[in-house]
Amino acid sequence: LFKNFSFLLIGVIRYSAIEKYSKLYLKTHNHLIIKYFLMNFKPSNKSSSICRAVLGPTNTGKTYYALERMISYKSGVIGVPLRLLAREIYDRLVSIKGAEEVVLNTGEEKIRGKHARYWVCTTEAMPAGKSFEFLAVDEIQLCADEERGHIFTDRLLNSRGQFETLFLGSTVIEGLIKIIIPDIEIVSRDRLSRLSYSGKKNISKLGPRTAVVDFSVDRVYEIAEHLRTSK
């Protein structure tokens, strides 16, 4: 028993040392790793479709622009990071195209119209192996997120529409996008209105066209549920 425990302890120590060294190596040699990746990177699916990155701060109409582009095609898919946002976009598309032509797929919730042509999904739930004339991914700067970054990175590298692809997000990712997709068209968006602080408010008594922003996913759903029940 002691012998087996000793082997286990040595294994844990070795693993911890390797993990610590790996993190140190990544930290000190990050530029070399990126350089190696870029030298050896080859897109897995080359496409002749239009590819644009629409970049700018919040409240610049990026998502609205993507929806306008999507409904101009016979089929389309958009991936967004939040289920609530997916639901909002779904409702908007249903009001334009009708419920029979729209799909909502968030992993937890799936509503599929009888003649569905337009898909609204959380980024993780975007259908693999299905072709669309138009494809968009929102908040593409989440490529840098520790937990979900691999999903957004995969979409950036591999997901394309037949005729048009849009990546929406912050300007912080512009440099990386240009390196990965050299011929991409960058579209910059300016804020459409001015944001200002108006003091503390009672969240149950907010007026129409009020935006509630929280930086915790759990709090977003909690606030949304509170607003629904307080109406």
Predicted regions and their residues:
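Loop/turn-to-beta-strand initiation segments
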Residues: 116-118, 131-134, 162-166
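Pre-Walker A adenine-sensing motif
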Residues: 36-45, 65-67
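Walker B catalytic acidic pair
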Residues: 138-140
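Post-DEXD/H (motif II) to motif III coupling segment of the RecA-like Helicase ATP-binding lobe
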Residues: 144-196
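Conserved strand-helix element at the start of the C-terminal RecA-like helicase core
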Residues: 75-86, 207-227
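Inter-Walker segment of RecA-like/P-loop motor cores
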Residues: 96-128
